[in-house]
Amino acid sequence: MASKAQNEEIIDPNGLDLFRLTMMVITASICGGIFSLAGDMAAGGANTGAVIVSWGICFIGVFALMMVFNGLSQARPDLTGGIYAYAAAGFGDYIGFNSAWGYWISACLSNVSFALLLFSALGYFFPAFGAGNNLLSIVCASVFLWFLTALVLRGVKEAAGINTIVTLAKLVPLGLFVLSIVLLGKFNVDIFMDNFWGEPAGPGFGEQVVSTMIALVWVFTGIEGAVVISGRAKYVRDVGRSTALGFAAVFTLYLIISMLSLGIMPREEMAQLATPSMAGILECAIGPVGAAIVNLGVILSLVGALLGYVIIASETPFEAALQGSFPLAFAKTNKHDAPVVTVLVSSGITQLFLIVSYVAASTYQFFYSCAVNTILVPYVCSAAYYMVIGWKNEHLDGPHAPSVGKARFFGTLGFIYTLFLVWSTGLQGVMITTILFAPAIPVYMLGERGRGKPVLPHLHDKLIAAVVIVVAVISLYLHFAGIAPIV
């Protein structure tokens, strides 16, 4: 029998086998948001039946989205500027710029979210930090942010040792949560079945399902990074397999944690838990030691992971500048080869949002909602581009390109799912998105003029820019007039 190496095309002789590749996808995909997911869904009014249906929608949609990124990476390996490069290739420079902007601002907002979650977890051990958004928390978070910024400016990269600590800090509490509830028999079927489809005076079933969408997408934000990791495969066929297996493993873990949580305490009590809610759930199951372990895991995970988030936030506009989407100044590096302009600007934006979180008393949940709203722009554009090349049968004749049928199916499904997510964000989502994207227009104009290129060359570009400005102005009026407050 011919060996596997003889029967399969090799990408990289030194690449990773299927098992190691899948493990890397799993560790890269597990998000700190899982530690607060159960409480966040409960706070939205979702009972057991709605949560189960929501997970079903999430599985179909997120898997389709992951296959979109996987298919695009194989169909267009020449586009190396990040997922926003797909928007530029399909719909022009202005759409590509907005896609890059959304990805960048989402990274900055994610930094704020995790900083607030970090100090909320610290508040369990040191009550002075409160819910993570008081003055002491913001001051300490700011100091930590600029300490990490200084490290990145000196050329520090995310180290393997830090990755190991972050991975263990996430996996140990999650494993303990599952095992302790199962082995100690703490799961209560009566609690799980109570008000299964909703409370008599509560929100309707459809409203319950929609309320969970942002929280569910948040815990899967970053799946495009898992696709990049899958590109380290030794064999061609393992690229898609590792992505699918890794996603299935992470999804199963998340689903088990979510279902077990519903059998520990009633929804009304879960909705009142402090962030991270998993700590309160495990404390209810096994006592204070459970809360201590979860909070410690969150702290260790985020202290290490925030360095990576600072790097990601700075690399996004840097790569976009190199690709021609952002102004040339964003491509400047210092003597340590660090992207000095983007590091400072990204940390400055993060700092501004930290101040806003204190002034407006905004929570971790509000900022991750904003992060999801902004990252939906590159997600929608990527899915739309994959759908377009599928139905036009373009760029699908390469040696590693997906089939036409696969591109059409997952492109269309991914596009429908991302549009559904945009709809599920509601009026608040539209207001937040336009307000955050309006400042992008002068930055785009500066970059295009610096390269001697026409600004908003197409009619649809002008229309999009005009709509963003008008809706942003209306949104600001509605907010400050108290008609539709954003926060």
Model-derived segments and spans:
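Hydrophobic transmembrane alpha-helices that form the core helical bundles
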Residues: 42-43, 63-145, 150-153, 158, ...
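Membrane-interface loop-to-helix entry segments
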Residues: 136-187, 243-247, 372-377, 433-439, ...
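Membrane-interface "cap" regions at the ends of multi-pass membrane proteins
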Residues: 1-52, 56, 62-70, 78-80, ...
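C-terminal membrane-solvent junction of multi-pass transporters and transport-like membrane proteins
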Residues: 333-334, 379-470
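Helix-loop-helix junctions that connect adjacent transmembrane segments
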Residues: 3-14, 52, 129-136, 168-295, ...
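Transmembrane helix-loop boundary segments of multi-pass membrane transporters
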Residues: 42-50, 120, 124-137, 157-166, ...
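TM-loop-TM module centered on a large, flexible mid-protein loop between adjacent transmembrane helices
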Residues: 84-87, 92, 124-129, 199, ...
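Loop-to-transmembrane helix boundary motifs in multi-pass membrane proteins
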Residues: 13, 18-19, 139-142, 234-236, ...
